[in-house]
């Protein structure tokens, strides 16, 4: 699943490709992608212009003229590409936005899990998923005191807590493993057992790691590509995720894989010792 760095990379690419383009027509090839009534979705967006593209956590927010916002969640395999409107539609393409300039924005999703929802701008914060999102992992918004209070209320494993989007927005399996390795925290450590210093280090590493991954264009493990069809570059900088058996870059101990909360989890058994 694309995490914050991948979604932000897609957002940046799309802003270069489709900003200020006007929709001429919309072709919905898989109706379940659209949360709204399909006819209403098409009618309301036809002749509208993309004015801006924002991101909140793992969600893309397409801002259209007439105060309309399309919420787009890529889920597992969702991708956006821009092609000439006359080009044959690729397999697994579910929605095509044809623009007046002869190009089209195409949503492609092998797994069919991605969704689009059209709302009045300002109402997106009340929709399921967005309503309870935690803070963005940035210096000004991700406050260590609030992070600490949230963790103190939770007995579950810190790995699971980091995947909880109400605590901090944008982390997924890849970067949760990475920031825990960086912070020398075992993924099964109860969240409420972390010291104040560990919480601070973890918070700082979350901000740092996601920023670095974003600048590298995200991480491509299997199929992720950005709007230009480019793979990410951060997979070459991973320390723990999917490095089972490789020596830890700090101590040389082989990285191990366990399952935490039904998620494959990678860590160093020497650097990251579990707390009971």
From Swiss-Prot:
The keyword Zinc-finger applies. Its cofactor is Zn(2+). CDD domains: EcFpg-like_N. Coiled coil: none annotated. PROSITE patterns: FPG_CAT, ZF_FPG_1, ZF_FPG_2. Its EC number is 3.2.2.23, 4.2.99.18. GO terms for biological process: base-excision repair. Monomer. Belongs to the FPG family. This is Formamidopyrimidine-DNA glycosylase. It comes from Ligilactobacillus salivarius (strain UCC118). The gene is mutM.
């Amino acid at each position: 699943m694309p995490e914050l760095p991948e979604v932000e990379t897609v957002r940046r690419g799309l802003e270069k490709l489709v900003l200020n383009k006007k929709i001429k027509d919309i072709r919905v090839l898989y109706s379940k992608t659209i949360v709204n009534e399909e006819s209403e979705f098409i009618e309301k967006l036809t002749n509208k212009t993309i004015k801006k593209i924002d991101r909140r956590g793992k969600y893309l927010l397409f801002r259209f003229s007439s105060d309309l916002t399309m919420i787009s969640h890529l889920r597992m395999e969702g991708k956006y590409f821009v092609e000439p409107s006359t080009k044959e539609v690729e397999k697994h393409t579910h929605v095509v936005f044809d623009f007046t300039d002869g190009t089209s924005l195409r949503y492609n999703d092998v797994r069919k899990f991605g969704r689009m929802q059209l709302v009045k701008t300002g109402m997106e914060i009340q929709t399921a998923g967005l309503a309870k999102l935690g803070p963005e992992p940035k210096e000004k918004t991700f406050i260590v005191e609030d992070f600490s209070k949230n963790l103190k209320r939770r007995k579950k494993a810190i790995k699971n807590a980091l995947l909880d989007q109400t605590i901090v927005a944008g982390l997924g399996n890849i970067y949760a493993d990475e920031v825990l390795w960086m912070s020398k925290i075992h993924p099964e450590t109860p969240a409420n057992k972390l010291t104040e210093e560990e919480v601070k280090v973890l918070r700082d590493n979350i901000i740092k790691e996601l920023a670095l991954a974003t600048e590298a264009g995200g991480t491509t493990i299997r199929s992720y590509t950005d709007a230009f069809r480019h793979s990410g570059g951060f997979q070459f900088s991973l320390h723990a995720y999917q490095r089972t058996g490789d020596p830890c870059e700090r101590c040389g101990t082989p990285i191990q894989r366990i399952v935490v909360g039904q998620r494959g989890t990678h860590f160093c058994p020497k650097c990251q010792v579990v707390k009971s």
